[in-house]
């Protein structure tokens, strides 16, 4: 497929006849938890005992991740908004798998689908890895599979920012009046290895820049709503991996402890790095970060995520319209946006050089280790299951690589569930 682009990486005037919602996936019940975790960690030698330890986090929630029901709700809202355009859903690590979604699109006669990834920021695990998953799905489905184009990142789009502002304002309102005006805003996103963060975007460093840009715009608009300027910072959650690998800091728990030690009396945790209340939010933030704050005497509230806010759903529809029409407005609320439509060659690539779909055609060519042995979809087995068994470089951002019991704060998916 040749995607027309301009010098800024804008691919406009593309005729798409379907939307594919692309997400991480999660277990639907207790019997799914260990198979799901094996999918996520396949080929990395993680002991069963360590998987069982992390599975206990799901036990707190009945062995079921919230992410699937949230994606079903988003899917329903998108279908209503985009009708008669069909909307499909596929996951990286659990049913419905991406390959199955692509196969359904082929059976339905879809020629080209726009792909909306539930990750707002540039990184390997939040963007390029999904494109690699799409490439694996296309290879698995084979001839007749639809062309795929990825919708741009939305970290500073009004449809993402404005709901987050409202959630911040509501969270502030739940704090005691005596400390409300001095509350700090702690914007949280998934931790990444510093090397991966440095490689994010076409020129490097995009993940941190985009996070700061989104946080700054949200904080500014919160101040306009409440009449008080709240100090803010970015912190990270869900780190995993060996301590020898440098990761982005500070951890949200360390940030909250430092605020309390410095005399702060209240904070609002703002999960800007996540679009729904999945496991990292309901466990890493609602359980562990809230416990850290409470132990330090810090009044704390957690802002909501965008979920199925009508403005967010409308944003997805607008992103589709952007790709279909060269004249469609491309709103962005920070100097970092709007993001490119078509990911440049090797964008967000940490060096593995694996084929990636939905970008420039050259990125779909094999650059690195072979991807042989990809076969038809099987229950409990993602389309890219074979990839990690052919000597590929280890991705330190993948969950559960730290085998020391108790050192990972959660299941720690690199881009969120």
At which residue positions do the language-model features occur?
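Intrinsic disorder/low-complexity segments
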Residues: 378-380, 384, 405
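Short, intrinsically disordered C-terminal tails of secreted or membrane-associated proteins
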Residues: 407-416
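Active-site-proximal alpha-helix that buttresses catalytic centers in soluble enzyme cores
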Residues: 2-375, 400, 417
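Targeting/processing segments of secretory and organellar proteins
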Residues: 375, 396-397, 405-406
């Amino acid at each position: 497929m040749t995607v027309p682009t301009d010098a800024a990486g804008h691919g406009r005037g593309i005729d798409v006849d379907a939307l594919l919602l692309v997400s991480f996936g999660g277990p639907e019940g207790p019997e799914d938890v260990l198979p799901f975790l094996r999918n996520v960690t396949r080929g990395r030698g993680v002991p069963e005992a360590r998987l069982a330890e992390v599975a206990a986090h799901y036990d707190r929630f009945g062995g079921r991740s919230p992410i699937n029901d949230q994606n079903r709700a988003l899917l329903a809202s998108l279908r209503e908004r985009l009708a008669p355009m069909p909307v499909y859903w596929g996951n990286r690590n659990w049913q419905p798998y991406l390959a199955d979604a692509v196969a359904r699109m082929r059976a339905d006669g879809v020629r080209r689908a726009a792909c909306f990834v539930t990750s707002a920021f540039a990184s390997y695990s939040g963007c390029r890895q999904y494109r690699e998953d799409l490439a694996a799905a296309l290879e698995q489905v084979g001839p007749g599979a639809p062309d795929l184009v990825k919708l741009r990142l939305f970290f500073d789009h009004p449809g993402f920012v404005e709901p987050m502002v409202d959630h911040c304002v509501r969270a502030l309102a739940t704090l005691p009046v005596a400390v409300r005006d001095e509350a700090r805003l702690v914007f949280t996103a998934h931790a990444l290895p510093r090397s991966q963060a440095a490689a994010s975007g076409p020129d490097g460093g995009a993940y941190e820049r985009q996070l700061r840009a989104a946080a700054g715009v949200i904080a500014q608009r919160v101040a306009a709503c409440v009449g008080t300027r709240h100090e803010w910072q970015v912190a990270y959650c869900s780190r995993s991996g060996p301590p020898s690998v440098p990761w982005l800091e500070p951890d949200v728990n360390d940030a909250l402890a430092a605020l309390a030690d410095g005399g702060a009396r209240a904070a609002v945790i703002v999960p800007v790095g996540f679009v729904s209340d999945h496991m990292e939010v309901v466990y890493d933030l609602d359980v562990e970060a809230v416990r850290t704050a409470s132990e330090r005497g810090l009044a704390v509230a957690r802002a909501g995520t965008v979920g199925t806010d009508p403005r967010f759903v409308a944003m997805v529809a607008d992103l589709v319209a952007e790709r279909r029409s060269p004249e469609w407005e491309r709103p962005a609320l920070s100097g970092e946006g709007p993001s490119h439509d078509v990911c440049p060659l090797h964008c967000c690539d940490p060096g593995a050089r694996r084929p990636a779909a939905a970008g420039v055609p050259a990125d779909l060519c094999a650059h690195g280790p072979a991807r042989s042995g990809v076969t038809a979809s099987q229950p409990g087995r993602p389309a890219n299951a074979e990839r990690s068994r052919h000597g590929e470089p280890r991705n330190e951002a993948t969950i559960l690589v730290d085998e020391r019991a108790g050192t990972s704060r959660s299941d720690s998916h690199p881009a969120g569930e």
